[in-house]
Amino acid sequence: MLGALLLSGAVHAAVQPLESVVAIVDNDVIMKSQMDQRVREVQQTIAKRGSGVPPAEALQPQVLDRLILENLQLQMGERSGIRVSDNELNQAIGTIAQRNNMSVEQFRAALAHDGLSYNDAREQVRREMIISRVRQRRVAERIQVSQQEVKNFLASDQGKAQLSEEFHLANILIATPDSASSDAIQAAAVKAKGIYDQLKKGADFTRLAATTSSSENALEGGDMGWRKAAQLPPPFGDMLSAMPVGDVTPPARTPGGFIILKLLEKRGGQGQAQMRDEVHVRHILIKPSEIRNEEETKRLAEKIYDRIQNGEDFAELAKSFSEDPGSALNGGDLNWVDPNSLVPEFRQVMNETPQGELSKPFKTAYGWHVLEVLGRRSTDATDQAREQQALNVLRNRKYDEELQTWLRQIRDEAYVEIKLPGATQAAQ
């Protein structure tokens, strides 16, 4: 009898349908359950915006493409030894809750109310942090803006007119590959014009962005947040300044394809004098690499910290060990810095470290740091603030363009086999 029951169970188990794979991505796979879960999350986000919710089938290609790009970046992070500790993750969750005026417990309750798992949300935040660190290493660190570019921008009509003006925007991107033929470019132009015509007739922007846009933020309804006009491709600056809130721009050709923008909100600065708190700080940066993993990097930073505590010279150790090319030869000295120009983790530790004291080793997207605060001051920084503002605008503009190019590149270079029924096959 027992044998019959076991056999019956085996037969029953054998006929259970296996979970299907919707894409093979280099050395990993994407399961249908992952895609379905993300589709549900996107539908909930769109519904909260008060827009018509597209059917799952209309969202699946966009969601799958997003999952493929995320997977490729996570694999890069794995190969590079990028990790996010539970402590870092807890801090990030706390920050997200705080931004939404909630405690962590209230945040958990809000997720449950929306039918979302707290553990799933934690893992999604972990993945996003890893992806952010991958992009920091592969994209952001390559971007250079010269002092001459900053001066030229500040002296230009565009810089003078647009630097203080900000726009809350959403976008739709109809992408064109770098090697696109004239026929492909023409087809993209026709598609963009068709979408624009629909929008002018009252079609829902959020829904169209989620189902047609190639932009990275498509599944968020194309929401780009607040942008300086000068961060945007040149055709849009003057257009947005004169445009009423709620209107959309005609499609404009950019290096990445044809873009349509919707103006959600608008605000402008007053150009008043600005006082700024500055900190004189020096640091030593140790980066993980393919030959030194995260734990080994942390241990090296701790050894350097101990040597400084035992009386060795900070500047000499920075010259010997620091992997920050901009400060190592200066003994790690970053000079006087605006805390707001630094990544949040570095800024927080610096602000909490008393003047004349050393921080314990801590981690940012760049690697492991030890810092020393040498001084604090408040200064009239109107000119410097404008220069920093211009630098950020130019850097962000270059970053946006470089990121899209890099994402297309890693997608083109990867082996991707689409197994979603009815989807375009894109195996390489």
Curated annotation (Swiss-Prot):
GO biological process: Gram-negative-bacterium-type cell outer membrane assembly; protein folding; protein stabilization
GO MF term list: peptide binding; peptidyl-prolyl cis-trans isomerase activity; unfolded protein binding
EC number: 5.2.1.8
The protein's enzyme class: isomerase
Gene Ontology cellular-component annotations: outer membrane-bounded periplasmic space
SUPFAM superfamilies to which the protein is assigned, alphabetical: FKBP-like, Triger factor/SurA peptide-binding domain-like
Main location: periplasm
InterPro entries: OMP_Chaperone_SurA, PPIase_dom_sf, PPIase_PpiC, PPIase_SurA, SurA_N, Trigger_fact/SurA_dom_sf
Cysteine disulfide partners in this protein: none
Annotated ranges, domain PpiC: 164-265, 276-375
Cell compartments where the protein resides: Periplasm
Catalytic activity annotation: [protein]-peptidylproline (omega=180) = [protein]-peptidylproline (omega=0)
Keyword list, A-Z: Chaperone, Isomerase, Periplasm, Repeat, Rotamase, Signal
Pfam family, one: SurA_N
Signal peptide extent: 1-13
Entry comment, domain topic: The PPIase activity resides only in the second parvulin domain. The N-terminal region and the C-terminal tail are necessary and sufficient for the chaperone activity of SurA. The PPIase activity is dispensable for SurA to function as a chaperone. The N-terminal region and the C-terminal tail are also required for porin recognition.
Function: Chaperone involved in the correct folding and assembly of outer membrane proteins. Recognizes specific patterns of aromatic residues and the orientation of their side chains, which are found more frequently in integral outer membrane proteins. May act in both early periplasmic and late outer membrane-associated steps of protein maturation.
Protein's name according to its UniProt entry: Chaperone SurA
UniProt organism field: Pseudomonas savastanoi pv. phaseolicola (strain 1448A / Race 6)
